[in-house]
Amino acid sequence: DYTTYRSIRFKPEQSLWHGVNDYELQFFHPGFLYEYPVTIHTIGESNKPERLAFNSDMFNYDGSASGLAGLTDEKSGFAGFRVHYPIKNEEYKDEFAVFLGASYFRLVGKNQVYGISARGLAIDTALAKGEEFPHFTEFWVIEPSEGKPITVYARLESPSVAGAYKFVIQPDIDTSVKVESWLFARDDVSKLG
């Protein structure tokens, strides 16, 4: 349930690139509404992708979630991830980008609050036959250089469409993202958005 899922919290000191980069990645625990885990890879100086294994030691399991610690293995994957960067000041790294659930993502700038999430792709919305929800299934995150934007590649899958995405995200007063996508039809689609 919602209360139990909210009681599982990522440990900030476990953030990827913690203490070595202005950017940090934090991860979301699989479960609750997020039944399709994603595989996350990072690409650093070696230019070779490294798969990030799920590790329950990255999370605090408080309250009603305390009995769940250790029940998820390293093959499980994560529900998604968020990116932190010192937008407001150098002492604190703000969350400014989130990839979580289906093909949803959202961004925020300095002194802003999140609004509605964007989607990588919407298929057959508001049709009698029902909507199809594509999912980002795999991510490759390029470790950014100092002062440069962060680049995220994503694989999108659904019964009707496969896709590849590139997000170049620049955190700032007005955080910006440049999105490139390549879509491949597997079946007929009535409505694409």
Feature annotation, model-predicted:
Residues 1-127:
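Solvent-exposed N-terminal domain segments of exported/luminal and surface proteins
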Residues 6, 41, 153, 180-182, ...:
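Short, well-ordered alpha-helical packing segments
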Residues 9-13, 158-160, 183-192:
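A generic secondary-structure signal for well-formed alpha-helical elements
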Residues 36, 77-79, 146-150, 161-163, ...:
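Residues at beta-strand starts and edge strands
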Residues 44, 56, 154-158, 171, ...:
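A mature extracytoplasmic/lumenal domain signature
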Residues 45-47, 143-147, 171-175, 187:
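A short, structured loop/turn motif at beta-sheet edges
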Residues 117-171:
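Extended, loop-rich substrate-binding clefts of extracytoplasmic carbohydrate-active enzymes
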Residues 166-193:
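Acidic (Asp/Glu-rich), glycine- and aromatic
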